[in-house]
Amino acid sequence: TNKPKFFAHDIVEATLSTYKPAFLICPDDTGKRKPEPDGLILACKKSNTNPKESFYIGDHSVDIIAGKTAGMKTIAAAYGYVPLGEKAEDWEADYMVSSPKEIMHLV
C-alpha cells in the first residue's frame, strides 16, 4: 500500500478480521511509494516468490505501473477505488476484472 504503516495497520485490523496477512509493506519499509516497484519487490523477497511468476492487483494507475516495472503480470481492479475521471481500462494492465471473483479465473 502507499499508506503510512500506522494508518494501514489500523485499516487491515478493522477490515480483515478473519484473515491476517503474513506481512504488510508500506512506504515506511522502503522509503519509496508506488509507482516505484520497491514495495512489490520486497514483498516477493519476503514471500520467496519470483516477480515474473506473480500477479499484482491494483485499483489505481500507479499500482499497474509498479507491477509492470517489477516484472509482474498486472490486474486492474475496476471495482476498487478507481480515481474519479479515470477508467481502469486505460491503465494498460494485462487483465481487468470487475469483481474479486473474476480474479480466481486468472491466477
Give residue spans per PLM region.
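Asp-based, Mg2+/Mn2+-dependent phosphohydrolase catalytic module
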Residues: 5, 9-107
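Conserved phosphate-coupling serine/threonine residues in phosphotransfer and NTP-handling enzymes
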Residues: 1-3
